[in-house]
UniProtKB/Swiss-Prot annotation:
Belongs to the CitG/MdcB family. Keywords: ATP-binding, Nucleotide-binding, Transferase. Its EC number is 2.4.2.52. One of its GO terms (molecular function) is ATP binding. It comes from Albidiferax ferrireducens (strain ATCC BAA-621 / DSM 15236 / T118) (Rhodoferax ferrireducens). This is Probable 2-(5''-triphosphoribosyl)-3'-dephosphocoenzyme-A synthase. The keyword Nucleotide-binding applies. One of its GO terms (biological process) is prosthetic group biosynthetic process. It is an enzyme of class 2 (transferase). It comes from the Bacteria. It catalyses: 3'-dephospho-CoA + ATP = 2'-(5''-triphospho-alpha-D-ribosyl)-3'-dephospho-CoA + adenine. InterPro entries: CitG, TriPribosyl-deP-CoA_syn_CitG. Gene3D superfamilies: Triphosphoribosyl-dephospho-CoA protein.
Amino acid sequence: MPTATALRIDAGSGASDLGEAIGRLAERSLVLELELTPKPGLVDRANSGAHRDMDVGTFRASIAAISPWFSFFFERGVDGSAVPVEDFLRYIRADGMACERAMFAATLGVNTHKGSVFSFGLLCAAAGRLHGRGRPLSRASVCAEVSHICAGLVKRELLLPAAARTAGELLYWQHGLTGARGEAQSGFATACAHGVVPYLLARAKGMDEERSLFEALLQLMAHNRDTNIVSRGGMEGLCLVQAEARRLLDCPTPSRSARTAQLAAFDQLLIERNLSPGGSADLLAVSWFLANLDELVCKCVA
């Protein structure tokens, strides 16, 4: 079983050190997403958003339980670097399910990070797979590798007979929403275009970490076809969330206090409507991970 890792992100040498550093980067991504406050409809330090069965303590326990697995996924990728790409998802599936069980044990059955287990499991394993083959690691190469690993995933897992449909499969059939599977199959196209790019642009303009994450979150909420929202409020709920996020983004660049007030009001709106953009929260964590991956790899291989 994986052992606990520290939050500190240090660069070391060798596959083991690289895997540990990437695992810590993934953990830090989840911590930053959780601590960002206020987040519309989401669990944060101020409240539980539109959720009734979880709070910030639940999320912290979940992060502590799943984070040790991230470096393990990297190691599995290294060990399985010779596994044909079309078989690799099956190769790591049992490990992903074991990580999910660790999450559920820590949260007493509450689903806090199932999407993140899927996304970061793939990202860390893909990084290990590339490293095991002597391929360079970068944001672009890791996303491309995830896309190769997940080729055909939407068709295989969402186009099932009606009797076998899960909630995610029903959303695909009803609205064409592909959720986390589609995002992974695309190589995290939404996260890259509407999370990584806005975050890096905000940082380049001199915004601090928190402001940059808020701007990235609003961009993701404006563009992501979030299945978490649709499962609660239908397409009408999704349209409401996207429209409000776009309205805030179209405002002239507000002061920190003004943006915080806007986000707090947006939070209350989504709490009243029982809408949670959990998919966009997952993508925000992925976006920060990808935005910082290249710098981390450079430090590790220097």
